[in-house]
Amino acid sequence: MERIKELRDLMSQSRTREILTKTTVDHMAIIKKYTSGRQEKNPALRMKWMMAMKYPITADKRIMEMIPERNEQGQTLWSKTNDAGSDRVMVSPLAITWWNRNGQTTSTVHYPKVYKTYFEKVERLKHGTFGPVHFRNQVKIRRRVDINPGHADLSAKEAQDVIMEVVFPNEVGARILTSESQLTITKEKKEELQDCKIAPLMVAYMLERELVRKTRFLPVAGGTSSVYIEVLHLTQGTCWEQMYTPGGEVRNDDVDQSLIIAARNIVRRATVSADPLASLLEMCHSTQIGGIRMVDILRQNPTEEQAVDICKAAMGLRISSSFSFGGFTFKRTSGSSVKREEEVLTGNLQTLKIRVHEGYEEFTMVGRRATAILRKATRRLIQLIVSGRDEQSIAEAIIVAMVFSQEDCMIKAVRGDLNFVNRANQRLNPMHQLLRHFQKDAKVLFQNWGIEPIDNVMGMIGILPDMTPSTGMSLRGVRVSKMGVDEYSSTERVVVSIDRFLRVRDQRGNVLLSPEEVSEAQGTEKLTITYSSSMMWEINGPESVLVNTYQWIIRNWETVKIQWSQDPTMLYNKMEFEPFQSLVPKAARGQYSGFVRTLFQQMRDVLGTFDTVQIIKLLPFAAAPPEQSRMQFSSLTVNVRGSGMRILVRGNSPVFNYNKATKRLTVLGKDAGALIEDPDEGTAGVESAVLRGFLILGKEDKRYGPALSINELSNLAKGEKANVLIGQGDVVLVMKRKRDSSILTDSQTATKRIRMAIN
């Protein structure tokens, strides 16, 4: 205040004013500052005094033919004096006014195409809805956000090649357009911009806006997708916010959102398979998002989310060096630690082996709804400053920090046994066990933590064990702040490794990510996600598994058929049958498998008993590890539609229905495709008839008349005998059984007796 008063006094004296306004600046340092380099040091001032001159603009000599020397009012538009140091003409700002009114016009057809991003922005704003303004304290935190809606996701280099190819096709220089998106965009833009008269440089700038993601590190309190960021200046100030609903969506935001959903689904599914890493890669490579291969999106899209980063790590891409715990992104800002295994006892006297971080460290913790600064020593929380949207979010952050601190009072606060498992039924590691335990109920943790009196510090208040604010007391070391903690700004990416259980580590061996960190939140994707991998069939429920399994067999029938007869074990081990197993009652899996495999073996042994429909129908059941038992089944149960439904071993059922006339299969009423039966199946399937309810008595016996065909055989009465022509022109004597027997005993004896009868 003193200084200001002094300055005011000085300014009131006329001599001061005179010195400041009239004296020339002759100090070398100052002259140097304002004259060195081409960068304008005071653009506003420069503009002011330039515009005060008569001819502040220079133009090409051609201007003299295109614009008259004087306008209607007789004012001079350009001067005959050359611009010093160039052969350009000095031009008055009035020339621009004249040109805008009288200059030649051009076709506007290309404008919406070149300035597409601007036209689309206007449309979004026109259809957007601005709500009321609320005055309240804004907790803004700086996040890396996408600032230009509607862009493709090309890398700078890829975009550069596309722009050169579209705008300057005749320029020298090698351009390699390899990715699908590059080729599509180039073709599309070349067509759109034929005969375009807009300055090439401008076209290049605008193309860059359309092709490349631009990010800035900005303070944000609300939505972070690009359609919100483009109106950031309208929706949030220091002490106010205005509600806004965008008037349209843009593909880049949809890609980001759908990518996260696809990655989460894939990681969750991979976790429960026999080889998580191999499965994850197979799924990433066979999935498309909005018609683009997921692996291409992963290579280009900078979205940082736990599941997305696990997929990137699996593909060998670099990811951010921060690590994730309890859904918060931790970034160490100072200090260091060494890790040591230590055994600790919970309040329930259960022994846990934890990796203790020894040493002083400081971290920033950033979550979706809360942020914090954490200072800790070996197994001790020194200070935690939290800010969050609401009580719930603040509590979540406090729990995560308390568990992360590894303090003894936290471990002693455990009541009951810790036995949380992941989706694959494996026990979680101790740190995640503790986290899950306290996320379920943190009452004891907060009560046992301890409280302390607090000093009155600007912008900080205390928080009590019941999560209510207080100005006098607070949980030990914990304070709530009005200010958020900025996200980690660096875009640095590091090389990581991933093990088969999808744990991602940096080069020092620190775990950055693991499947436990992947959010369980469900969402509906904006773009269509097409999972071609059989592992994702179950995402739409049991019915989809059933239909997809049979569709897969039918689509690949030619190869399946060969494998069925030559290398069945390899066929049974196909991963496409894995999802189906979850539909078969656990207790019956092994028995069904043993039964079906035996049946198939007989079909292979007995010539002519091949039955396409039956093989397709029963094949998925043979994939489970078989149990050797003499169990016979006339129907097999699958769990769909909330109950067990039957598939008949012989004949149709609502689950599996083959229409002989149309040769089409329907599974649960859904068409599963057309079956191509073997040409000799309908006629020469004698043996299958022999197998079904007939007993082979021996070689042909002339007393029973000429050999019958299969079709005639069905007219026999029970107990009646007849000669039958089988397979390779051999004739045997059979008798229709007096009772309906089991398939297996029939076919076993039939096999042996045919051999005996023929030999």
Swiss-Prot record:
SUPFAM superfamilies reported for this sequence: PB2 C-terminal domain-like
Site label Avian adaptation, positions: E627
Coiled coil region boundaries: none
Subcellular location: Virion; Host nucleus
Recorded GO MF terms: RNA binding; RNA-directed RNA polymerase activity
InterPro entries registered for this protein in UniProt: Flu_PB2_2nd (IPR049110), Flu_PB2_6th (IPR049114), Flu_PB2_C (IPR049115), Flu_PB2_CAP-bd (IPR048298), Flu_PB2_middle (IPR049111), Flu_PB2_N (IPR049106), INV_PB2 (IPR001591), PB2_helical (IPR049113)
Signal peptide: none
Keywords of this entry: Cap snatching, Eukaryotic host gene expression shutoff by virus, Eukaryotic host transcription shutoff by virus, Host gene expression shutoff by virus, Host nucleus, Host-virus interaction, Inhibition of host RNA polymerase II by virus, mRNA capping, mRNA processing, Viral transcription, Virion
Recorded family membership: Belongs to the influenza viruses PB2 family.
Function: Plays an essential role in transcription initiation and cap-stealing mechanism, in which cellular capped pre-mRNAs are used to generate primers for viral transcription. Recognizes and binds the 7-methylguanosine-containing cap of the target pre-RNA which is subsequently cleaved after 10-13 nucleotides by the viral protein PA. Plays a role in the initiation of the viral genome replication and modulates the activity of the ribonucleoprotein (RNP) complex.
Protein's UniProt name: Polymerase basic protein 2
Lineage start: Viruses, Riboviria, Orthornavirae, Negarnaviricota, Polyploviricotina
